[in-house]
A protein has these predicted regions:
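Glycine-rich His-Gly loop
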Residues: 75-79, 172, 219
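Serine-hydrolase catalytic machinery in alpha/beta-hydrolase-like enzymes
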Residues: 50-63, 69-160
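C-terminal catalytic histidine-bearing segment of alpha/beta-hydrolase fold enzymes
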Residues: 241-306
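Bacterial N-terminal signal peptides
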Residues: 8-17
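N-terminal cap/lid segment of alpha/beta-hydrolase-fold proteins
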Residues: 24-66
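Sec/Tat signal peptide C-region and signal peptidase I cleavage site
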Residues: 18-23
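Primarily recognizes the serine-hydrolase "nucleophile elbow" in alpha/beta-hydrolase
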Residues: 149-210
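The feature captures the conserved acid-bearing segment of alpha/beta-hydrolase catalytic domains
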Residues: 190-257
Length: 306
């Protein structure tokens, strides 16, 4: 009961203390400069089917040599940066046969978290403060545009290796990064939004082309998505009213912000991915001998020595 009271109080703080006009202003800081994309790959973790988490040189070689990769997912973390739940999501994708890149945005020079704190209650409270300030918050269009710049640079790099379909994924603030995407990039084939809404305080951020398919998940009373018993988290149905066939929405009557934890949630996303990509997940080596790739990786590592 006490925890429910705290959550409700913090939700009120988070939603009421944020004037819409301030939130919609573009507020730039050096951390959002486009020049900071130059080290995005140094701020990223990479995953490959069968292998899991790998370093960059190994990723680059296996993208060209490992047969059967279904596509590439760029997964964008939430307001707290790269934590365990983001890794859990990335692991789901690679086990489904996708290569994955997870850029960490908050480690750009001079950047800050959108929700600092040592407990979930403190983080939610301080997320409201950051939103009220209007700079280091997902409500700031400049922040999401900068995250889009990071994604664009990752895509540019990926295109030097593969023409596989690319999917933009995100959790929480990373979901807002995904639905803020409006750049012409034919290789991007869809979006995936974990546990985030598009309520009125965030509508100014929506730029997604609804001709592209999207999978989304939301819990009715998730405080991080602005949800409560009286006012459930707002899904994307209204945004997709002209193309409803392109939205797959997973809803749950709960209050968790954690991705891929509810019955049926994993299967829903798995089914959606299979509709987008006809190739099946990689279940075995299929004759691939890792030793055949070693020389290429060794050469990459030699070339990378400064």
């Amino acid at each position: 009961m006490k925890n429910n009271f705290i959550t409700t109080a913090l939700l009120v703080t988070f939603t009421v203390c944020v004037p819409t006009a301030i939130a919609q202003q573009w507020q730039d800081v050096p951390a959002y400069a486009k020049s900071q994309t130059k080290n995005v790959l140094d701020r990223s973790i990479f995953y490959v089917p069968l292998f899991g988490s790998v370093y960059r040189a190994k990723f680059e070689v296996l993208m060209k040599k490992l047969p059967g990769i279904r596509g590439v997912v760029i997964h964008n973390h939430g307001c707290a940066g790269m934590w365990g739940w983001e890794t859990t999501v990335a692991q789901f994708y690679y086990r489904e046969g996708f290569a994955v890149v997870t850029p960490e945005f908050v480690t750009r020079d001079g950047n800050k978290l959108g929700c600092p704190g040592g407990t979930s209650e403190e983080m939610l409270k301080r997320a409201g403060e950051r939103a009220n300030e209007g700079v280091y918050t997902a409500k700031n269009p400049a922040r999401l545009s900068a995250r889009g710049d990071d994604n664009q640079e990752v895509i540019r790099w990926l295109k030097t290796m593969t023409d596989l379909p690319i999917f933009l994924s995100g959790h929480s603030e990373g979901c807002r990064t995904t639905y803020n995407w409006n750049r012409t990039e034919p290789q991007v084939k869809g979006g995936i939004c974990h546990k985030q809404s598009v309520n009125r305080l965030y509508e100014h951020l929506w730029k997604w082309d609804t001709r592209l398919p999207m999978w989304s998940s939301n819990e009715d009373e998730d405080p991080w998505a602005g949800g409560s018993k009286q006012f459930p988290a707002v899904g994307f149905e209204e945004k997709f009213k002209d193309n409803p066939q392109n939205l797959t929405s997973f809803r749950f009557a709960g209050n968790s912000h954690d991705p891929l934890v509810r019955p049926g949630e994993v299967q829903s996303l798995r089914d959606w991915l299979s509709k987008q990509v006809s190739a099946p997940p990689i279940k075995s080596q299929n004759g691939f001998n890792y030793e055949d790739a070693l020389q290429n990786i060794q050469n990459e590592l030699k070339n990378n020595v400064k």
